[in-house]
């Protein structure tokens, strides 16, 4: 390939986080990788390789989490500094793995080489569209991470009234615990002042079937002002496991057109 050649890359590279415990037994082989491309996720390594090739256009399938999770976006900074997302559509991994126990959003993304690239603010304000003709923008929502600790915090919290399991995204919440009784490395200490917010997450999990697949890699959404009005209801629902009509209406209003019956 000559530097003067126009290069278009189209593909669906493998992607898998080698540090994940899921199916870890098939990820324990190490291979020599260019130091500029080495990454914990194979799909990320492919994107970085496309940047090294200086492709003019790239049309590729990859997990939506590469874009919407800020930590992933930072890992791919070299790529996003040179490419702009100009079109996309989101599909479910169910298309490829219909018998999988869990589905996640995949984006079919068209990138154009651009010397300005994109930053995370661009992603937060980008209108993502799905194959189901839904459109969403991250900045249309507020998220729970603004108000509570999602990861172990025992070095900072001494007055705990409860313990909660480590939180990640909505898909992780689908399969993880919420409140826990036994301390562990993944325990988040819950102070009294934040207890109702952790109850909110617990109730969110109870109603998680109404959250569509394309929000799977998002943080847990919240309308804080409306939550405060129903704060006692959320505490009660967390304990009783019964969601009253006010809470059900809250979630329907929170998700709007994205509410999945």
Task: Please place each PLM-identified region on the residue numbering.
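Short, conserved secondary-structure transition motifs
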Residues: 94-102
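Flexible, glycine-/basic-rich loop-and-beta segments that form/coincide
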Residues: 103-161
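C-terminal target-recognition/interaction regions appended to catalytic cores
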Residues: 164-261
